[in-house]
Amino acid sequence: MYTAQDEKNLNEIKQFLDDNGIEYSTEYDNFCLHYGNPDGKRSYEISYVPSAMYPIKYPKYNIDGVGMEFFYEQSYKAEHEQNSFKCWVKDYEWQDDRKREVLKSYFLYAAGKIKKTFYARECEVREVPTKEARDFESKNCFYGKRGASLNLGLYTKKEKHGVPKGTLIMIYTFGHNFFGKDNSIEVLRVGTLKFCNVAGGASKLLKYFLRNYETLTVGKKEVPVEIIKFYSDYDHNIGGSMDSLGFEFVNYSGGGFMNYWLETGEVKGRQPSKHKWVMEQMSEGKVLAIPNAGVKTFVMHVDREKYPLIEKKPEDEPSKVLF
């Protein structure tokens, strides 16, 4: 059933949990934290996926497999019927050095084992220069860097946990909502320095944005800060804190997919301009479409009575208007 690489991956996950004193119940490729829902706590299932065993079926290419909503349906059932959350870990994700470290950070947070906790009051908000923002995302965000119109970050006011004063430890980035037809803004990336937690950090960054920006400059366009959308990666996050931040749940996308090249291990998302070529590669047995759980969509309709704009003086610089 499993390849030697799968066995290695599973052993590494188990060893990491053991080394960090994380309690779990296990069965085959599933490591369940908070098994039995102690004190009503939602279980957290680390579910390993040998991706080549779960391709999306394409009968015309003689590919047996599953439906595109295979993982979404299991995630939905776990969330709504079993008081659990499934964190899907594809083999190619664990074998990616950068993503593996982000996943480890997720596991520690879920288990309450993060050792470096900061508080929002110990940080100041600044606009993050583009290069610094993309570098931070590349190291600390699961899906890496993504261009944005505005990058806001939390910087430490003093040294703590061996992290120097003035270090960027959390980021929120904003841009135009790519998928929406409305005049809305999207939270593009949210990331925290790996193996750290910033209590109250998301709230501080979001409030700063809402109170300091009436519009967002996107290219040559000024987009009013009225509607904000957030797409939560349902493969790895349940979006449990969104309501406390003022977002309302809208819908599930259902399943999505990534294209996986078997020979090189390369993984890419949907490429509309190369669709014909990708299908040719699939017909030749070189690529498989691997399903995922899709996203959960949340929206905020900005209430200006709750988030009144801060009046700025002409001499104020964006990085100095702190909240």
Q: Where is each model-derived feature located?
A:
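C-terminal "cap" of GNAT-fold acetyltransferases
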Residues: 260-283, 287-305
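Short catalytic/ligand-binding loop motif for oxyanion handling, primarily in non-cytosolic enzymes
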Residues: 54-57, 95-98, 145-146, 236-241, ...
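Short beta-strand-loop-alpha-helix junction that forms the active-site gateway
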Residues: 38-73, 177, 251, 261
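A conserved beta-strand-loop-helix scaffold within acyl/acetyltransferase catalytic domains
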Residues: 102-245, 249, 254, 297-302
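Acidic-basic catalytic patches of nuclease active cores, encompassing PD-(D/E)XK
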Residues: 1-27
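Short, cationic low-complexity segments
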Residues: 309-323
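Short secondary-structure junctions
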Residues: 18-29, 144, 248-252, 283-290
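Catalytic cores of nucleic-acid endonucleases
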Residues: 60-98, 202
